[in-house]
């Protein structure tokens, strides 16, 4: 595959930003085998933002010839008091439910489930003196102001009462980039600040230098779009506010989980925010984009409508769909029905997995979330 084709795969939806595209093109042209990584907290059921959106970009990177890695961030999750701060439970869930769910979704999206390396944070850090030297070295090159700035809105608002663990978290994220040799650190757009820190220290640290053909380079940060919460009631004022209004596993009505039944998917989408003609911030349109229009269509996507309202509509691309909706030619109810059908179809193999071989994993997760 030539460089332009690889670049096109990496840059396509759901990618929203690359820092920088020029640097990405340079390291692709070098012909060097590149490493990627994306990290996940272990905190509950996996929703489609974490599962489908993130993994679709992992699959794109696989196809572009990049070594993909998923960091199961158990220590980070413990610092953030996920799953009740029970480190043993966090680790068990990470290497069972999270690994198997991600593998199944990668397979469903057309990727190689065995072609991605899964790394438990504890394993990366265990008996690894160089990692801890790297972490300390990173802290030598960061200011308190920089670390505070990299926190979420909530963290920045906490002022002097912020737990120290929250301030340890960003340097850990930065260290992970270099310890995993990740030329392409990847995450939602809400991870941008941490990746900027990694770029700022890249030429200063002494341990785990990031190189391409013996030349030290900065990590190229890849950020994908965040799926907006279904239950939002108004358009966010900024991208930063949008990051606080994304799908959240802690707010079930805001998210569609990868194990949801077709009936549950339909019920949730029926209640979703979907103003007529609104295309800039519309969760339902985003669901269609990630399910029905992720790949170039070989047959038209059909939006079913009663004959008295004009009958079925055939759509070939997301851009065409967006235009029709903006012009008021598709009713929100018809859009919601189409999104429910498309998403349920995409997730059907995942749903069947959790009804069959993955049933025990799902049951254990339900028991854990109930007791927390």
Curated annotation (Swiss-Prot):
Its EC number is 6.1.1.1. One of its GO terms (biological process) is tyrosyl-tRNA aminoacylation. GO terms for cellular component: cytoplasm. L-tyrosine binds at residues 37, 169, 173, 176, 191. GO terms for molecular function: ATP binding; tyrosine-tRNA ligase activity. Keywords: Aminoacyl-tRNA synthetase, ATP-binding, Cytoplasm, Ligase, Nucleotide-binding, Protein biosynthesis. It holds the Pfam family tRNA-synt_1b. The keyword Magnesium does not apply. PANTHER family: TYROSINE--TRNA LIGASE, CYTOPLASMIC, TYROSINE-TRNA LIGASE. This is Tyrosine--tRNA ligase. It comes from Pyrobaculum arsenaticum (strain DSM 13514 / JCM 11321 / PZ6). The gene is tyrS.
């Amino acid at each position: 595959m030539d460089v332009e084709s690889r670049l096109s795969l990496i840059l396509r939806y759901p990618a929203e930003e690359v820092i920088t595209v020029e640097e990405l093109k340079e390291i692709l042209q070098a012909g060097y085998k590149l490493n990627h990584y994306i990290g996940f907290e272990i905190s509950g059921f996996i929703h489609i933002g974490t599962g489908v959106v993130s993994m679709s970009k992992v699959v794109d990177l696989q196809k572009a010839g990049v070594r993909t890695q998923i960091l199961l961030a158990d220590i980070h999750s413990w610092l953030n008091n996920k799953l009740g701060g029970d480190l043993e439970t966090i680790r068990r869930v990470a290497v069972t439910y999270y690994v198997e769910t991600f593998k199944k979704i990668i397979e469903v999206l057309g990727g190689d489930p065995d072609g991605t390396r899964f790394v438990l944070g504890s394993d990366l850090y265990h008996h690894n003196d160089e990692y801890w030297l790297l972490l300390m070295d990173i802290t030598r090159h960061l200011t308190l102001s920089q670390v505070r700035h990299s926190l979420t809105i909530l963290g920045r608002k906490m002022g002097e009462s912020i737990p120290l663990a929250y301030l340890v978290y960003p340097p850990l994220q930065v260290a992970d980039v270099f310890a995993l040799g990740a030329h392409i650190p990847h995450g939602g757009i809400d991870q941008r600040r941490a990746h900027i820190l990694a770029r700022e220290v890249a030429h200063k640290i002494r341990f785990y230098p990031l190189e391409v053909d013996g030349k030290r380079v900065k990590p190229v940060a890849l950020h994908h779009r965040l799926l907006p919460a279904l239950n939002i009631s108004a358009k966010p004022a900024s991208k930063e506010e949008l990051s606080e209004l994304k799908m959240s596993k802690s707010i079930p009505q805001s998210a569609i989980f990868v194990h949801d039944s077709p009936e549950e998917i339909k019920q949730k989408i029926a209640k979703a925010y979907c103003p007529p003609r609104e295309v800039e911030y519309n969760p339902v349109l985003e669901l269609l984009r990630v399910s029905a229009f992720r790949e170039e269509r070989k047959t038209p996507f059909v939006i079913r409508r009663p004959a008295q309202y004009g009958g079925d509509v055939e759509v070939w691309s997301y851009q065409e769909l967006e235009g029709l909706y903006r012009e008021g030619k598709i009713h929100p109810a018809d859009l919601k029905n189409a999104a429910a059908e498309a998403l349920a179809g995409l997730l059907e193999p995942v749903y069947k997995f959790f009804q069959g071989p993955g049933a025990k994993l799902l049951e254990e997760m339900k028991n854990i979330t109930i007791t927390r």
